[in-house]
Structures are given as C-alpha cells and as structure tokens.
A protein has these predicted regions:
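Intracellular alpha-helical coupling/juxtamembrane segments of multi-pass membrane proteins
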Residues: 234-277, 281-288
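ABC ATP-binding cassette signature C-motif
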Residues: 1-247, 293, 297-630
C-alpha cells in the first residue's frame, strides 16, 4: 500500500527543468534510495515530499494522518542548547498539549486534550526522549556546539525518531559518519518499521539498506526494484535499449528529411500524412533530452618520486596523555594506493602528517623518500576562497593550466568538469557542495604532484563522478593516500589499508593488503589465529615435561585417537612453531626497504609465501584444536 505518491510533477529554476512530469510512489515499509547527478534536483524533490517546497505543477497525495520527518544534509542547531532540548523538539506537539492540560486554561476542553494526550503518548514524552538518546548513544546533557559533525547527525536522527514518524526522509545521512557509525545507521534503518526515502551516493550503504532505487534523470523518475547492485545491472540494459531506440529514431528522421527535400512533385504524389509524420518526428527529437555530459578527469603526475615514499619504524605519537599512534611500522612505496580507516578522532590525519613529514613522532623514526611533490584534497574545503571565481581558483592570474605536460585553456579545463564558461566566471560561494568538490578536484589535478592526499573526497560527489575518479586513481602512476568512509570506493581504489585497531591497545594501527572487505576478512582471520594461539600455550605448559604424550593422551580423551591421528597431534605443535618462525622471518624481510630494490623477484615470492603461511597456520591450528577435542 502506497503511503504517498507524486504525479506529473514539474519544477524549474530559470530555464533548467529539474522535474519534467516526474512521478513515483512510496510503499509502506519500503526503503527507497534516490540517486541522480549533482544538480538533478534530488534535494528539491525530497523537500517537496517533506512539504518544505512546492512544485510548479503536479499532485502530492498523502495518506490521512501521515507523519513525515525530514533530516537535512547539514542540520542547524542552537550551539548553546543541550542535546536533550534539541531532541525534545521532535515531540513539540506532545509537550504543548500536555502543558495546556496541566495549566487548566479557562475555556479549554480538557476531555479533548486528554484524548489528544493519549494519542500522542504525551504523558511519557520525557521517557521517549531518554530512551532514544540511550539507543543512539547520546549524552542529553552535552551542548550541541561541543559535538562533531557525525554526532550532530545522530542528534538530528534522534529528533526525527522520537516523533515516531511513518516516513523518514534523509538527505546524505552518511556524510561525517565514520565506518562504525555507518554500520550502526544501516542496522537502525533496516529495523525501522516505517518507510524510508534517502539520498546518498554511498553505494555500499544503498546495497545494505535500499529495497528499491529511484533515479532522477533529466527530469524523469525511473524505478528499479532491489538494491544498488540490482540497479546497476538494470541500468546497463536500459541505456543500451535507449541508445538503440535513439539510433532508430534518428535514422527514420533522416530518411523522411531526404524525402521532403525531393520537391513539390514528391509532395503531390505522397500522402499529406507523411509530412505530418515528419513534423512529429522533428518535434520528438527536439523534445528528447540527451544524457548530461561526463566529467573528464586528467591528472598531472609530475616528476616521479623515489622508490620509497616513507619508511616508519616503531613510530609513536601522543598529545599529553592521549596516545594516537603506538609502535607503528610500515613501508610505503611509489605507486602504492593506501587507504586509512578508523573512527572519527582516532588520529588518521595525525598519522598522515607523520608519514608526510608535517609532524615529528614522539618516538620512533620516519625516513622519507626524495622528490616528493604532495597535493591535498581538503574535506573541509578550507583551501577555497569563496569570493574568487572558478577560473581564478584553478589558475590564478593566467588563462592557461598545464596538465600532463600539455597547456589547456582554463575554460576548456573547467568544461571537462561540467562547468560552463558562464559558471566559470561565477564566485565559488554560489556553488553547491558537490560543485565545490568538483572545483577542488579540478584544482588538485592541475597541480604537478606525485603524491595525492585525499581526505573524504567522496562527500557530495555523484555516483558517475565517483566512478570516474576511481578509474583515474587506479591508473595514477604516483602514490595515493585516501581517507574515506566510502567502502566501495576504498575497495575499488586502494592496494593496502592502514586500519585503526585501538580497541585492542591504545594507538594501535595495522597495515593490511587490499581494501575494506579484504581488511575485514584478514582481521577476522588474524583474530582467530591469535585466539587459537593463546589457547595452545597453556595446553603445552600443562603437560608434564617427562610424561610421554602418547600415554597421557588416552586418559584425557573420550575416544582414543588412532595411531596416525596421535602422531599427527604430536607433530602439530612443532609444525605450528616452525610456521610462526618462518612467518616472523618473512615479516622482517618484507620490512626491509632495500630488499625491494636489490631483489624484487625474491620479494614477490616472499609476499606470495606470506599469504600461504597464513592459510597453513590457520589450518594447522584448526586441526590441532579438532584432534585435541577428540
């Protein structure tokens, strides 16, 4: 059953039509993911559904009594207010009705108020707020001004949830959230009993949350059942069909144009209906809105750096009593694509500054490579002068930029990033969040750099631009450091991941091969290895030194092992010890930066053997545990 529907909606700003006969419905209990290009009108559509804006034409129908709550992309709160007071605004009607009842104002119908109080559960609004704060791990007594962007997002969600809405509208809910918070939000939304409509460019989030995707494209809404992965398959088929249909229509139009030019005689001998048909074809082609242009990304890689970008040995960093990095070891080589993941405030930026020489460690050593030319992408956009034009931002004092050794006019370069010449002369302050990120990317890629540092580059970028950025970074010859909470982006770009694991020990960071999913798999495997290794030690110590193992084994086992199994059990501790020793030796070899230069073939074999040892060690420990349980 549809709880709301929008039909034949039209909305335009100037000559740009954002909605052009758009229509969709939202079913009870479904989670709708709204996607589309930056500037396509997604936020405007969400505000229309929320009742904050009105379309130029069209009809929005809601079921009677439908409660809708809208959480904007950047919630604005009174910085001096407490979290409890802000969240309580979500039950403003319940508070007002109960206050009116308690004040017994003259002429007030107390029976009607009592009925309304019970309908709103107004007697218990404080408990509802407290319960919601507890569920979202928020401290009601804290001032909002003290909170991070991610915690402010939680406050906005709490304010919406405490109202018990039938429909929850979310605009970019994952912005400013770390990976743990995103996983928490996914679980919360999957358990939400009402309907959800959200805008996000986080493809993994859409895969895990959405039950249907709707795409706003050239003013029209198209619906795709399933999550984002299902949408990708359907979209590919749809675009192929559209291309074939357009080609057929253009061919037919060309044939009719040839006929109409044959002259008066042809028009006398042919049906007037054919002329009318041609006019219809011309009108259809003029009305057909072509797909928007694609961002074209190029990057100036500058002169190559040395083979080693940075070598860190037992590096630690603390600020007072707070330990951000403890005993970290890593070797970063030219061409590595390194992802840094961890919760907000864990020290990702601090670790990056240590690697790049902007901070000196309180302990340990950092050896940095030669000829490093570093370019930064700033997630807070602090490098942008809001009063400067786009052209001056990209190329101050010049009409030309140099990219990849070739000169290019700044207007042409900005056009590659979908900025028209008129837009190129506009001040930065007139741009949306996504457009400002595109300007930052344009500026970043115009710099001659062999090391790129990207801090949350995916915020506000549409999916098409994200995919093109992924392709560019994959083919980039220099070194990339990427701080991101976009799991799909990490998986598609990075070759290794430096992950915060401070929940085990303060300031602990570990390096893993591969992206986010590989990190999750390897971390789970390593955790299992550590747990099993911890169990084997007390077992060995418990055995009397002089007691022969075969004689002791049958007493401890419910079923006697076979001779072959007993021999295997006796040999397994030796094999495990040997594998651990080999693993340690290979780790020491891999940590030697000079070895990569002296014998790259040997290092490739060592890397391969390192992965094999993990598998063999895990298998040996599991077998030892299985035999020991018999």
């Amino acid at each position: 059953m549809a709880v709301l529907s929008l039909s034949n909606a039209h909305l335009a700003f100037g000559h740009v039509a954002l909605l052009d006969g758009a229509a969709f419905s939202l079913e009870s209990g479904e989670r709708l993911g709204l996607i589309g290009r930056n500037g396509a009108g997604k936020s405007s559509l969400l505000k229309i559904v929320a009742g904050l804006e009105k379309p130029d034409d069209g009809l929005l129908q809601l079921t009677q009594g439908l409660r809708i709550c809208y959480v904007p992309q950047e919630p604005l709160f009174d910085a001096a207010a407490s979290v409890f007071d802000i969240v309580s605004e979500g039950v403003a009607e319940a508070k007002s009705v109960r206050s009116a009842y308690e004040e017994h104002a003259p002429g007030v119908d107390l029976d009607a108020l009592q009925t309304r109080i019970e309908a709103l559960d107004a007697w218990n609004w404080e408990q509802r707020v407290d319960t919601t704060l507890h569920q979202l791990h928020l401290d009601g007594e804290r001032r909002v001004g003290e909170l991070s962007g991610g915690m402010k997002k939680r406050v906005a969600l709490a304010q919406a949830l405490v109202a018990v809405p039938d429909v929850l509208l979310l605009d970019e809910p994952t912005n400013h959230l770390d990976l743990d918070s995103i996983a928490w939000l996914e679980e919360l939304l999957r358990g939400f009993k009402g309907s959800v409509m959200l805008i996000t460019h986080d493809r993994a989030f859409l895969d895990n949350v959405a039950t249907r995707i709707i795409e706003l494209d050239r003013g029209i809404i198209r619906s795709y059942p399933g999550n984002f992965s299902a949408y990708e398959k359907s979209k590919e088929d749809q675009l192929a069909a559209e291309a074939q249909a357009s080609a057929r229509a253009d061919k037919l139009l060309a044939q009719e144009e040839v006929w109409i030019r044959k002259g008066v005689e042809a028009r006398r001998t042919r049906s007037v209906a054919r002329i009318q048909r041609l006019e219809v074809l011309r009108a259809q082609r003029q009305a057909r809105r072509e797909s928007l242009g694609q961002v074209r990304l190029e990057v100036d890689t500058g002169a190559p750096s040395g083979k080693i970008v940075a070598e860190l040995r037992d590096v630690s960093m603390r600020f007072g009593e707070k330990v951000l990095v403890s005993g970290f070891n890593a070797t970063i080589l030219r061409g590595d694509k390194v992802g840094l993941i961890g919760p907000n405030g864990a020290g990702k930026t601090t670790l990056l500054k240590l690697i790049l020489g902007e901070l000196e460690p309180t302990a340990g050593t950092v050896r940095r490579g030669s000829k490093l030319e570093v370019a930064y992408f700033d997630q807070m956009r602090s490098v942008l002068d809001l009063d400067a034009t786009l052209a001056d931002t990209i190329s101050p004092g010049s009409e030309w930029v140099e990219v990849g050794g070739a000169r290019k006019h700044v207007m042409s370069y900005l056009n590659d990033f979908l900025f028209s010449p008129e837009r190129a002369n506009s001040p930065v302050r007139t741009l949306s969040g996504g457009e400002r990120n595109r300007v930052l990317l344009a500026r970043l890629f115009a710099l001659p750099a062999n090391v790129l540092v990207l801090d949350e580059p995916t915020n506000d970028l549409d999916i098409d631009t994200l995919e093109l950025l992924e392709e560019l970074l994959q083919n980039y010859a220099g070194t990339v450091f990427l701080v991101s909470h976009d799991r799909r982006f990490l998986d598609n770009v990075v070759t290794s991941t430096i992950a915060w694991e401070g929940d085990e020990s303060p300031g602990l960071w570990r390096e893993y091969e591969g992206g986010y999913e590989e990190w999750r798999t390897q971390r789970a495997r390593a955790q299992k290895l550590r747990e099993q290794a911890a169990r084997i030690v007390p077992s060995d110590k418990a055995k009397p030194a002089a007691a022969p193992a075969p004689a002791a084994a049958p007493v401890a086992k419910p079923r006697k092992l076979s001779y072959k199994e007993q021999r295997e059990l006796d040999e397994l501790p030796k094999r495990i010890t040997a594998l651990e020793a080999e693993q340690k030796a290979i780790n020491e070899l891999l940590a030697d930066p000079d070895a990569y230069v002296k014998d790259p073939q040997r290092m490739a074999q060592a890397n391969k053997r390192h992965a094999q040892i993990d598998e063999e060690l895990l298998a040996a420990l599991e077998r030892w545990e299985a035999l020991g349980a018999k």
